[in-house]
Amino acid sequence: MEKMLRMESLTNMLFTSQTPNSRHQKRRILPIQISASRELGQKTWIEWTQGIRDTISLQEDTIVNNLWLRSPLGYNADIYARKVSSDGFQGSSVERLVRDFENFKVKILHPASYSININPQIWDMYIGKILPRLVKKHGYGYGDGDKFMSAELDKVCLLAISRRIHYSTHVAEASFRAAPDVYEPAIIAQDRALIMDLVMHPAWEEATTRMMKVKFRNFEELRHWDEYSTDDKIDPSLVPDLYGRWIMPLTRQVQVEYLLKRLD
């Protein structure tokens, strides 16, 4: 029962869906959350877990903003064509811009986080699934001439999505510290399926997907999107789909990979 209470309390703190203005509201901290970490003091633990929630919310805002900036430009297919440059780099113009993908790390994380990189999957998802839907009404398959801007905005979109997904290592670390005796047997056994079951929070994922739809709608109002023509608007289902079908599953994958190495 105590184990379940520890897990539930952390879940309530990290995975309670926020309204767009709830980041600045006072949160109820349960006593069990304060004693959850073996290594962090009371104040540090509270600040850290609250910081994780706030950072994730800001990352979500950044993703929506970057997609909006990218959407008016054309696909510019040739910026994704792989070439060999004069300095020997083999890849597309966008790959060159993002080859030094930034994985956000801080000392509080276990060194296992440094070896986790699923950027190739993020690349395939963004270029193959998201971008065609994002720009399909703005010349998909037809270059609008502004290749540099298209490539630069693809870079910032990719970086924002990558940071959000890889930041889930912080969520995994917080979950582990809250209930190490729950996670350690599965980690020692290298039981990937059990760890996946531990990190899954279906209700929170569904709530997050719904919240992204609300954030997108609020963003439209903030940007006075009602003044734009229909062809200049992003498909309203794109952002929720991005989260529900791709970002949330990839964040789970990162958490599992991190936890499998947590005791190394």
Please state what every model-predicted region is.
Residues 11, 16-264:
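Extended amphipathic alpha-helical regions
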